[in-house]
UniProtKB/Swiss-Prot annotation:
Heterotetramer of two alpha and two beta chains arranged as a dimer of alpha/beta heterodimers. It comes from the Archaea. InterPro entries: AdoMetDC_C (IPR042286), AdoMetDC_fam_prok (IPR003826), AdoMetDC_N (IPR042284), S-AdoMet_deCO2ase_core (IPR016067), S-AdoMet_deCOase_pro-enz (IPR017716). Its cofactor is pyruvate. One of its GO terms (cellular component) is cytosol. Pathway: Amine and polyamine biosynthesis; S-adenosylmethioninamine biosynthesis; S-adenosylmethioninamine from S-adenosyl-L-methionine: step 1/1. The lineage of its organism: Archaea, Thermoproteota, Thermoprotei, Thermoproteales, Thermoproteaceae. This is S-adenosylmethionine decarboxylase proenzyme. GO terms for biological process: spermidine biosynthetic process. Keywords: Autocatalytic cleavage, Decarboxylase, Lyase, Polyamine biosynthesis, Pyruvate, S-adenosyl-L-methionine, Schiff base, Spermidine biosynthesis, Zymogen. It catalyses: S-adenosyl-L-methionine + H(+) = S-adenosyl 3-(methylsulfanyl)propylamine + CO2. Gene3D superfamilies: 3.30.160.750, S-adenosylmethionine decarboxylase domain. Binds 1 pyruvoyl group covalently per subunit. The active site is at 71 (schiff-base intermediate with substrate), 76 (proton acceptor), 91 (proton donor).
Amino acid sequence: MAGGVGGRVVVGRHVYGNLYGCDSRVLRDEAALITIVKEAVKVANAMLLSIGSYRFGPGGGLTVFAVVAESHISIHTWPEHGFATVDVYTCGDHTDPKAAFDYIVSQLRPKRVEVFFGDRSMYGE
């Protein structure tokens, strides 16, 4: 992974955010969310290992979670509030977590997005 400063080595990049004002029908559509996450894996240039989903009660929110060789991609939804959180964490210079995040946002079409970035780092000895 990309080198760091002062012995710090970035081993992963984390892009995550809050999506407000999403269409609640999409946030309840398990098949659509699974398709979106699978495509986000491709956009990130990651390798899908497994994908799962869980619905929180009838008509409730969903969690869709992809385990990728490089880490994970997830969407958690609260359709009753038109709200979703998205989490994309990848390791390796070959991956692009921001592109995957942007793809998911383009599919959920929120009215407002808060996005955060974090480097996961370690220090050499």
